[in-house]
């Protein structure tokens, strides 16, 4: 009988479990955060469910909750993917199979790079083009990103989830010059395989 009372109270009240503990406070939750051009796997699903649960709990406690999905959408893996696409991919296959095709050619890249290390040099060169704003490189990258987001949104829609921010790693690509200058001025950068590292 007690359990039924709790169930009835919960079903008939929209404020069950609510408080104003978080009034005038903001909390940011960064969750899900899948990698672009890769499958949405169980590890992403776990953090997605946990993050969304935390969002619901903090919202009920009166917090303003900012839901952040920090996508893995920038980095040398895109140089590898561009090389793979140009060597073994086709627009038709990517349009038809989406992320599955991108994963297939990415795996092919790694298999071939074990036999031919020059592929890694090509990949670094393509990523450098991306960083320098090369139109072709950025167009291919954006296409890969759009295909991935379409698939991610399909999953989020099934789960009934929304986010306040989808800004991924690429958001910061034009904001790092000041940080790099400071690291350079402080003597903290060194060159390694054509890249500057800390």
Language model regions located:
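NTP-dependent nucleotidyl-transfer catalytic core
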Residues: 1-198
């Amino acid at each position: 009988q007690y359990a039924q009372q709790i169930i009835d109270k919960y079903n008939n009240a929209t404020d069950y479990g609510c408080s104003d503990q978080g009034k005038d406070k903001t909390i940011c939750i960064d969750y899900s955060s899948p990698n672009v051009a890769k499958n949405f796997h169980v590890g992403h699903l776990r953090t997605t469910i946990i993050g969304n649960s935390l969002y619901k709990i903090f919202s009920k406690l009166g917090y303003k909750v900012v839901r952040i999905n920090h996508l893995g959408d920038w980095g040398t893996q895109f140089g590898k993917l561009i090389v793979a696409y140009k060597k073994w991919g086709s627009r038709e296959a990517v349009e038809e199979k989406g992320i599955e095709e991108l994963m297939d050619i990415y795996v092919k890249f790694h298999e071939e790079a074990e036999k031919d290390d020059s592929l890694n040099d090509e990949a670094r060169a393509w990523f450098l083009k991306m960083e320098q704003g090369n139109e072709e490189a950025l167009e291919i990258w954006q296409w890969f990103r759009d295909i991935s987001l379409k698939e991610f949104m399909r999953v989020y829609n099934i789960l009934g989830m929304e986010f306040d921010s989808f800004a991924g790693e690429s958001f910061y690509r034009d904001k790092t010059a000041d940080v790099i200058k400071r690291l350079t001025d402080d003597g903290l950068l060194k060159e390694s395989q054509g890249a500057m590292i800390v």
